[in-house]
Regions:
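Secreted/periplasmic serine-hydrolase-like ester/acetyl group-modifying domain
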Residues: 135-136, 145, 149-253
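Alpha-helical transmembrane signal-anchor/signal-peptide segments
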Residues: 41-63
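Substrate-gating cap/lid alpha-helix
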Residues: 265-280
Length: 280
């Protein structure tokens, strides 16, 4: 009898342990499902839908948020380039050019970055894209044609929803891009000024710039770079990363321009005897 009672107690304990484990797993899986559902609903990286009208989105991660913006925002044109373009207000393009323009800047962007985002744009919008405003940075167009400035988050750049788990179950996405904006709405991004640099006219003025400016060391004439120093690398980038989109989309106007670098930048370029190479 005692032996049977002991067996029954052990079986009860096993059953209780199984129930507890099943309950824990159920709660755990329900929590994961809830987190995934919340991320899909708010979608702070815009992978599945347009922004919710009421949500105070924080848009400050170019590599991870630009792909969704390219896929799901409404626009006639795009603005691409480095951090120089991040200072632009896209309302200007609508006022002056009549184009609803989406900013898709990448700080320090290489031509491959521009190619990646243009591929997404044209795949998503096709001939709806009326204009591409592309800033050409002299210092980056000689980069390796297959290199991006920062590592690309592949699962955000493709259309495979089955590899999105790192996005859907991401602590930083949940805390920094959903809960924090809800708790403090003052950090919500202005859609016309996405990725706007932190400096303002109050701090970014002639006196402050000159206070911290240190001129580059001046080189001798014999150290000057040849005018065609960057030519081959730039041509390779144009052939691989830029011209294919221009040729494939005759319905789209491409406005290619040099962004307005500071005169101090050009002073450094001149002192380093690189002016002919940079503008060549």
């Amino acid at each position: 009898m005692e032996e049977n009672e002991g067996k029954e107690k052990k079986q009860k304990k096993k059953m209780q342990a199984k129930r507890w484990l099943a309950g824990f797993l159920g709660i755990f899986l329900a929590g994961l499902a809830g987190c995934m559902a919340l991320v899909i609903w708010v979608d702070p990286f815009f992978q599945y839908h347009k922004p919710l009208a009421w949500f105070p989105y924080l848009v400050d991660n170019q590599v991870n948020q630009n792909p969704g913006l390219a896929k799901h925002m409404d626009y006639d044109g795009i603005l691409i380039g480095s951090s120089m373009t991040a200072s632009f207000n896209t309302d200007w393009f609508e006022e002056l050019m009549g184009m609803k323009t989406q900013k898709l800047s990448y700080n320090g962007s290489y031509p491959k970055d521009l190619s990646n985002i243009m591929q997404l744009v044209f795949d998503a919008k096709g001939d709806q894209v009326k204009a591409v405003y592309m800033a050409v940075d002299q210092s980056t167009f000689s980069a390796d044609p297959e290199e991006t400035k920062f590592p690309v988050t592949d699962y955000l750049y493709d259309d495979n929803v089955f590899n999105d788990v790192p996005y859907l179950l991401n602590k930083d996405v949940l805390l920094d891009y959903i809960l924090r904006p809800l708790a403090d709405r003052k950090d919500a991004s202005d859609w016309a000024e996405l990725y706007k640099p932190w400096w303002t006219d109050e701090y970014y003025n002639k006196a402050n710039v000159l206070m911290y400016y240190e001129a580059a060391e001046e080189k001798q004439e014999e150290e000057a770079l040849a005018a065609d120093y960057f030519k081959d690398a730039v041509e390779e980038n144009l052939q691989k990363n830029i011209l294919p989109y221009i040729e494939a989309h005759p319905e789209t106007e491409f406005y290619i321009f040099y962004p307005p670098y500071s005169i101090l930048f050009w002073n450094d370029v001149t002192r380093e005897k690189e002016l002919e190479a940079v503008i060549g």
